[in-house]
Amino acid sequence: MSAFITFEGPEGSGKTTVIQQVAQKLENQYSVVLTREPGGVKTGEQIREVLLEGDDMDDRTEALLFAASRREHLVGKVIPSLENGKLVLCDRYIDSSLAYQGYARGIGIEEVKSINEFAINGLYPDITIYLDVSVAVGRERILKNQRNQNRLDQEDVKFHEKVVEGYKKIIHNESERFIVIEADRSIDEVVNATYESISKYLEKL
């Protein structure tokens, strides 16, 4: 059984930790492929380094690079995995571009969506898990955990508040695709809630 499940959330939502632990739980029942964006394949990882560790760049260039990395990732990893009946869990996907570049950068959600629709060629997630946490809590976690901060982490509070606003708009418009998980709880609680939600969805397939 194949399914494409993406994970989204603002910085400090615990997304990467949650997806890894949820994947371990799901592996007891399913053949799971865990991947991430930007990255996931060699070319995608090279673009990731430019995007997250490089110097400041034009907003539209940033959006185009994310879309290019996404296309390489789909063709090289996601699509083959789905065709082989895998359960694909992806750390970030198109909604990140819409929230970060489309809304927070001010390019426009519809403009960035058009770029990405060309890249994904109709391959939307079956469901998207959104880990909902406030900007204040997210930034506090990043500082507490002493996580290496990339170029996007270092944006100011207003930028990250806009990211959350952008996500909320996207979720409002596509509520049937999203499962919203309160992520201001302990990691164990968030992992369990996420695992239960995904399991319920998969049982219906």
Swiss-Prot record:
GO terms for cellular component: cytosol. ATP binds at residues 9-16. The keyword Zinc does not apply. GO terms for molecular function: ATP binding; dTMP kinase activity. Transmembrane segments: none annotated. SUPFAM superfamilies: P-loop containing nucleoside triphosphate hydrolases. Belongs to the thymidylate kinase family. Phosphorylation of dTMP to form dTDP in both de novo and salvage pathways of dTTP synthesis. This is Thymidylate kinase. It comes from Staphylococcus saprophyticus subsp. saprophyticus (strain ATCC 15305 / DSM 20229 / NCIMB 8711 / NCTC 7292 / S-41). The lineage of its organism: Bacteria, Bacillati, Bacillota, Bacilli, Bacillales. The gene is tmk.
